[in-house]
Design a protein with these regions (language model features):
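N-terminal helix-cap/turn-to-beta initiation motif at the start of protein domains
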Residues: 20-30
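Central antiparallel beta-sheet cores of small beta-barrel/beta-sandwich binding domains
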Residues: 40-113
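Edge beta-strand at a domain terminus
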Residues: 132-166
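Short aromatic-glycine motifs in intrinsically disordered, low-complexity regions
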Residues: 75, 126-134
Length: 166
């Protein structure tokens, strides 16, 4: 009887681990960002390149604004548009989360450490943007996966149209 209970517990544990295991590429695709300081919601694509994950915005859900990177610390880049700017970068997948990345905040022109976790249902990601590597001093940013019915409204950019932060 004791062996049966142990076998059932092991099976239950393994089932739960496998059922909720995340694939590294689960975050790729189109997302709605959290609203910015002007209440614009970006359409963002997360993609994989050389085993790291990156994100750029290319449209707004609720606006046709063309927005420049006016707070970039490099003055010569302030007239460039945010469209196509890779502002979440170098994320590495390990132990069910994406970490060791950076995220640029165009509202203040600063770059922060970034760690990403995916919700159990795969419809939401939480980005922890922090000034310290441990994520203690920072804030959470929530992005929502685009519903499949809305994906055809948007056309991602070609990789040749993207630009790195600096």
């Amino acid at each position: 009887m004791k062996n049966k209970i142990i076998a059932i517990l092991i099976f239950t544990f393994l089932f739960n681990v496998l059922a909720f295991a995340q694939n590294a590429d689960d975050i790729t695709g189109l997302w709605y960002s959290q609203a910015d300081s002007k209440n614009r919601i970006s359409v963002v694509e997360i993609y994989k390149e050389n085993n790291k994950y990156y994100a750029y915005s290319f449209a707004y859900k609720n606006s046709n604004d063309i927005v420049n990177d006016v707070n970039n610390p490099k003055k010569e880049l302030r007239n460039l548009p945010l469209k196509g700017l890779v502002y979440l970068y170098d994320l590495e997948f390990s132990n069910g989360e994406w970490k060791n990345g950076k995220i640029y905040n165009p509202d203040d022109g600063k770059t922060y450490n970034a760690k990403v976790t995916l919700s159990d249902n795969g419809r939401e990601i939480k980005i922890r943007a922090s000034v310290d590597g441990a994520g203690i001093f920072g804030k959470n940013i929530i992005w929502q996966k685009l519903p499949s019915s809305e994906v055809p409204k948007y056309k991602s950019l070609n990789k040749s149209e993207l630009r790195k932060l600096n």
